[in-house]
């Protein structure tokens, strides 16, 4: 999150959540981490970074022919692109997109070229950082030049668990995905879902109730371990997860 972010930035004056602010627009944006993550993982590779990124630069520069599905997606998102950007992005054009059109992304090509030539500094400092923060200021976002310059990628151990003899590997905190997956899979592990029938009311209800419990835990306990204490061992323990399902009644919604 940006350094100036606060715990109530997505709340109204009465303390009620303003969901749109956390999901769309400049205020919803966290400091971009993909570039730092790519450079952190690159040390395990063999090819030079410039060679790896060059095909993407050329594709963005020359463009590619879009499919009918891609045209529908771009057209369907046009209003959102126009609403949440102060400068029209490459994904928006005057007339509707159609299959066979070429999507050219000159700004992306320029951004990737700066990364190719200057490494991480080509993104987190200099021209790209300036462009990002200027857009943030125009749109009411919080990402600053200092946020970008100070960004680092953190290496964390993945979540690993067993499910019916299979080893499952998931994302660690601050992503909740890995722990949520572990909770949900463990809560249904001793149940014969196949016998319920695909997409039957019984199987759908079971999955809904399992997800409700996991996401309730997500809202209550999960977050960035650098800032909050997440009771990982408890949330993933067989005893705890069995207790979470004690009030599950087939055919009835849990209050």
For each of these PLM feature ranges, what is it?
Residues 190-255:
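Internal maturation/activation junctions in enzymes
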Residues 1-125, 129-172, 176, 236, ...:
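Noncatalytic scaffold domains of N-terminal-nucleophile
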Residues 34, 177, 203, 207:
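Hydrophobic (often cysteine-bearing) scaffold residues that line and stabilize catalytic clefts
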């Amino acid at each position: 999150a940006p350094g100036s972010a606060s715990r109530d930035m997505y709340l109204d004056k009465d303390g009620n959540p303003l969901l749109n602010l956390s999901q769309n627009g400049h205020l919803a944006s966290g400091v971009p981490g993909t570039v730092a993550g790519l450079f952190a993982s690159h040390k395990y590779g063999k090819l030079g970074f410039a060679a790896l990124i060059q095909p993407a630069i050329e594709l963005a520069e020359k463009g590619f022919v879009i499919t009918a599905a891609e045209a529908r997606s771009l057209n369907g998102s046009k209003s959102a692109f126009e609403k949440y950007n102060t400068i029209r992005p490459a994904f928006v054009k005057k007339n509707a997109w159609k299959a066979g059109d070429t999507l050219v992304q000159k700004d992306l090509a320029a951004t990737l070229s700066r990364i190719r030539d200057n490494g991480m500094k080509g993104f987190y400092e200099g021209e790209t950082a300036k462009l990002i923060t200027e857009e943030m200021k125009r749109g009411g976002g919080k990402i600053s030049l200092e946020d970008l310059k100070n960004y680092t990628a953190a290496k964390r151990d993945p979540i690993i668990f067993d499910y019916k003899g299979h080893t499952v590997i998931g994302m660690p905190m601050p992503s909740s995905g890995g722990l949520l997956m572990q909770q949900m899979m463990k809560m249904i592990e001793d149940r014969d879902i196949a016998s319920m029938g695909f997409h039957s009311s019984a199987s759908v209800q079971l999955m809904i109730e399992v997800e409700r419990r996991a996401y309730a835990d997500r809202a209550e306990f999960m977050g960035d371990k650098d800032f909050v204490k997440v009771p990982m061992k408890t949330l993933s323990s067989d005893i705890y997860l069995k207790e979470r399902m004690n009030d599950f009644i087939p055919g009835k919604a849990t209050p």
